Each structure stands twice: as C-alpha cells, then as structure tokens.
Amino acid sequence: MSNWLVDKLIPSIMRSESQKSSVPEGLWHKCPSCEAVLYRPELEKTLDVCPKCDHHMRINARTRLDIFLDEDGREELGADLEPVDRLKFRDSKKYKDRLAAAQKDTGEKDALIAMSGKLQGMPVVACAFEFSFMGGSMGAIVGERFVRAANVALEKRCPLICFSASGGARMQEALISLMQMAKTSAVLARLREEGIPFVSVLTDPVYGGVSASLAMLGDVIVGEPKALIGFAGPRVIEQTVREKLPEGFQRSEFLLEHGAIDMIVHRAELRPRLANLLSAFTHSPSPVSA
C-alpha cells in the first residue's frame, strides 16, 4: 500500500496541482450582479459589460480613455504633476504612505488622467477618474489636471469630456481638496462663457465633492446604466432621515426619471452617441465612424 501511495497517488496529486498553478491568474471574472463566471478575453471584447445581464463593471481610467478616444494623436496632460503631503496628514496611516500604496497598486501618480486626442476624427479633450486610486478622491493634483485639460479645450476650442468615478473630496488634503470644487467650477464657467461644450459622463460611483461640483456641471450629463450617483451614500441618508429610501434611489435611471441627468447611454454606444452630439454642438461635419 505504501509503495502504491508513493509511486502512483502522490505523483498524480502533484501533477494535478502543477496543472492548476499553470492557469494564469485573472483569466476568469465573476459578474458582481448575476454571478456568471466570464472569460476575461471575451469580457474585454464587450468593454467589461456582462454579456449575460448587461451589468456595467468598473474599469480603470486608462482603459476608459483607450476605448473612448481614437488611437492616433493622443497626448497626456499634466502627467508630470505629483501629489505632495503639505499638511503632513495622518489618520490611521500617514497620507504619504497611502499615496505610495495607491501609486504602487494602480501605476498612476494620482486619481485623474487627462488627454487631448480625437473622437471619431473630431478634436476633443477627455479626462477620466481612477477610482482605484484612493476612491477617485479629488485633491490638488486632480483639480489641477482637470483645469489644465479645460484650458487646452479653451485654447483649441474643442469639447471637454469627463468620466467621473469618485467618492468625493480627498479628506487628507482638507481645505486644499475643498478648494478644488471652486477651482474646477470656475474653469467650467469660462468654458460656458466661450461656448465650449462640456459633457459629464457619470460612471459608478460618483459622490461627495465631485458630484457637488464638476460632475453635475455638464452642458450634457450622461449616466452609465445603473451607476450610483449622489452626494451622501444611501446608508448615510437612511440613518439620518430614519426612513427607507425608494427602490433604485441614486441609480442613474432614478436620476433620469427625476430630471437630474439628461440621458443614459450604454458603454458600447458612447463613442458614436457623443461624437454625433458634439458634432451638432460645434457645427462640425458628421464624424467618421470608427
């Protein structure tokens, strides 16, 4: 019996374990909505939208800009800017340590990426929040990158688009982060005065100081399906008012029904829909489909 264990069974188990470990990590993904197990390469083809239930999964900022902008002519804006712990802030952890961890995990310097480029041949400037970087919170660098993006849009007289995904202002930067609400709102007022279109795309989730400033100041406000959008979270509101909130409260569909946003657009339709919309706004020729 012992010879059989040594000669047959143990090698068989070891081969099985070896085969398991040879399967690359991240090859399969479970949908958080319907729990279907999805093959990652196939999921990427659907832009991280579940083919079973149409749930729009969260995607990182670079992926979002990659699928939105044309491949040619992209230029990143404000890539040299890095956050500084001016207040030497510390809660359960030092702010500088939180920044270092977020930078290591995401490969980004901060929570907003801005690029100039083209949308189906039309010059645009686009920004996207990186929610994985400290919850997409808005601090000095996020505000400054957004302002630089808006200034490039002013200079080129081309539309500005921002994909928001944020928990709000970055508490570790205190008043500096709150100032970004006024700073971003002020530059958007300049765009409006100059007749430059600003489209705000609300993805899951958008809360706090970002929803109370730039995210809700679009000439057109677009929501992704079932995105959570609000100022305070539903749990906080329920605890405050001591009442049960309506079904679907703070979902993009609820906001559309109550006039807080203008439209809901499926991720796969976003490029052509926004290209046609911006073409009409800017009196440009119809965009080239791509």
UniProtKB/Swiss-Prot annotation:
Q: What class of enzyme is it?
A: transferase
- Give a GO cellular-component term: acetate CoA-transferase complex
Query: What reaction does this enzyme carry out catalytically?
Result: N(6)-carboxybiotinyl-L-lysyl-[protein] + acetyl-CoA = N(6)-biotinyl-L-lysyl-[protein] + malonyl-CoA
Pfam families in the record: Carboxyl_trans, Zn_ribbon_ACC
Q: Which GO terms describe its biological process?
A: fatty acid biosynthetic process; malonyl-CoA biosynthetic process; negative regulation of translation
Which controlled-vocabulary keywords does the entry list?
Answer: ATP-binding, Cytoplasm, Fatty acid biosynthesis, Fatty acid metabolism, Lipid biosynthesis, Lipid metabolism, Metal-binding, Nucleotide-binding, Transferase, Zinc, Zinc-finger
Q: Which InterPro entries match?
A: AcCoA_carboxyl_beta, Acetyl_CoA_COase_Trfase_b_su, ClpP/crotonase-like_dom_sf, COA_CT_N, Znf-ACC
Presence of keyword Ion transport: no
Q: Where is the CoA carboxyltransferase N-terminal domain?
A: 27-290
Gene Ontology molecular-function annotations:
acetyl-CoA carboxylase activity; ATP binding; carboxyl- or carbamoyltransferase activity; zinc ion binding
Zn finger (C4-type) ranges are: 31-53
- What does the note accompanying the cofactor annotation read? Binds 1 zinc ion per subunit.
What pathway does the UniProt record associate with this protein? Lipid metabolism; malonyl-CoA biosynthesis; malonyl-CoA from acetyl-CoA: step 1/1
> Where does it live in the cell?
Cytoplasm
Task: Give the principal location in a single coarse category.
Answer: cytoplasm
Q: What is its EC number?
A: 2.1.3.15
Residues binding Zn(2+), per UniProt: 31, 34, 50, 53
Write out the similarity annotation: Belongs to the AccD/PCCB family.
How is the quaternary structure described? Acetyl-CoA carboxylase is a heterohexamer composed of biotin carboxyl carrier protein (AccB), biotin carboxylase (AccC) and two subunits each of ACCase subunit alpha (AccA) and ACCase subunit beta (AccD).
What function is annotated for this protein?
Answer: Component of the acetyl coenzyme A carboxylase (ACC) complex. Biotin carboxylase (BC) catalyzes the carboxylation of biotin on its carrier protein (BCCP) and then the CO(2) group is transferred by the transcarboxylase to acetyl-CoA to form malonyl-CoA.
Protein's name in the database? Acetyl-coenzyme A carboxylase carboxyl transferase subunit beta
Source species: Pseudomonas aeruginosa (strain ATCC 15692 / DSM 22644 / CIP 104116 / JCM 14847 / LMG 12228 / 1C / PRS 101 / PAO1)
